[in-house]
Amino acid sequence: VYLVDPDRVDGFDPEKPESWGEYAPQPLADKGIRTLAPPLFALVAPGEGHDMVPSAYAKAIKTAGMDIITWSLERSGPIGRGNGGWYYGSVKSVATDDGAIYEMVDTLAQEVGVKGIFSDWPATVTYYANCMGIK
């Protein structure tokens, strides 16, 4: 698992491939890395209406044939009190209430296709996985 720390790359933007620097997925896959672990905001973008959708970075990781583990779901505290801070930065416009946590999990699981989500409070991801029949 290769940890992605966007703060190490000036101007990292999950929607701009030219900004990914050392974390560009295809060169990492070419080196034999099979799993990337970027933070939440690198994997989702605002969609139409109030939806979250996979980011360009998430799509590039999947195109490179890599698995994804992400972090950290509930590090930001209540979403409704500040739109999630750093971890939800890419979707501030659609993450406006505490239910956004489940919207994030659903987008990551169903559309991005992550293999795992690190969370400070595992009850949220466990509840989601049990409801959705995810093993």
Outline where the language-model segments fall:
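Catalytic cores of phosphodiester-bond hydrolases, prominently lipid phosphodiesterases
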Residues: 1-135
